């Protein structure tokens, strides 16, 4: 059963502010038909808008996000810092998603978790992954893509911060292990963050 419109409004409002169209992928039938009617391929901005609109209006699954781990790259951090950082990102999230005609994954999501300083950090946005099915068993899938979103952190006084990050996943049926890597400098950034995603 679909959740109330208010939750979807939050998802769309966040993601529409932050999507980075240069990375948008072709979406489903609506986008393709629009391009045919105009007799040309859609532009970057139009393709990004179509991906957001199709995911918003034609989502196929709801998703539960459960943060699983945070790992600070030991090659770029002093031990004194990693010893006191939190690497158990308790939290949860919700999203909606669809597969386009190529079988690729598109999502709008919201998630909140405990950050490195054990403070709450919300993030919301749009996610895309190109999907591969390397085995004869089509239930096993690999994904590679990006997420474009907005996050807010306690140590930045909860000022909205745009983010554009790589994303990869390993999926079996409805369960996915999904992760990103936040690049950075010495004692800053360089964090591997992973979560479980369950479709229902």
From Swiss-Prot:
Function as written in the Swiss-Prot or TrEMBL entry: Transfers a fatty acid residue from the sn-1 position of a phospholipid to the N-linked hydroxyfatty acid chain on the proximal unit of lipid A or its precursors.
Signal peptide segment: 1-24
Record GO biological process: lipid A biosynthetic process
Active-site positions on this chain: 72, 115-116
Site positions for Role in lipopolysaccharide recognition: 81
Gene behind the chain: pagP
Flavoprotein in keyword set: no
Localization (cell): Cell outer membrane
Subunit: Homodimer.
Family note: Belongs to the lipid A palmitoyltransferase family.
Swiss-Prot/TrEMBL catalytic activity: a lipid A + a 1,2-diacyl-sn-glycero-3-phosphocholine = a hepta-acyl lipid A + a 2-acyl-sn-glycero-3-phosphocholine; a lipid IVA + a 1,2-diacyl-sn-glycero-3-phosphocholine = a lipid IVB + a 2-acyl-sn-glycero-3-phosphocholine; a lipid IIA + a 1,2-diacyl-sn-glycero-3-phosphocholine = a lipid IIB + a 2-acyl-sn-glycero-3-phosphocholine
Keywords annotated in UniProt: Acyltransferase, Cell outer membrane, Membrane, Signal, Transferase
EC nos: 2.3.1.251
UniProt protein name: Lipid A acyltransferase PagP
Cellular component, GO, one term: cell outer membrane
InterPro entries the UniProt entry points to: LipidA_acyl_PagP (IPR009746), OMP/PagP_b-brl (IPR011250)
Species the sequence originates in: Dickeya dadantii (strain 3937) (Erwinia chrysanthemi (strain 3937))
GO molecular function: acyltransferase activity
């Amino acid at each position: 059963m679909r959740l109330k419109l208010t939750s979807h409004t939050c998802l769309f409002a966040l993601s529409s502010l932050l999507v980075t169209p240069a990375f948008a992928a072709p979406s489903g039938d609506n986008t393709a038909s629009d391009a045919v009617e105009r007799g040309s391929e859609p532009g970057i901005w139009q393709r990004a808008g179509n991906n957001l609109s199709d995911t918003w209006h034609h989502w196929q699954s709801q998703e539960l996000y459960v943060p699983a781990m945070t790992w600070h790259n030991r090659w770029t951090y002093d031990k004194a810092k990693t010893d006191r950082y939190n690497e158990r990102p308790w939290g949860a999230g919700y999203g909606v998603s669809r597969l386009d005609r190529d079988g690729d994954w598109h999502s709008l999501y919201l998630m909140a978790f405990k950050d490195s300083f054990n403070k709450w950090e919300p993030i919301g946005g749009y996610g895309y992954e190109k999907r591969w099915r390397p085995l004869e068993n089509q239930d096993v899938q690999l994904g590679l893509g990006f997420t474009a979103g907005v996050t807010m952190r306690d140590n930045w006084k909860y000022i909205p911060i745009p983010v554009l990050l790589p994303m990869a996943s390993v999926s079996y049926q409805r369960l996915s292990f999904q992760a990103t890597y936040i690049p950075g400098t010495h004692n800053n950034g360089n964090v591997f963050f992973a979560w479980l995603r369950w479709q229902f």
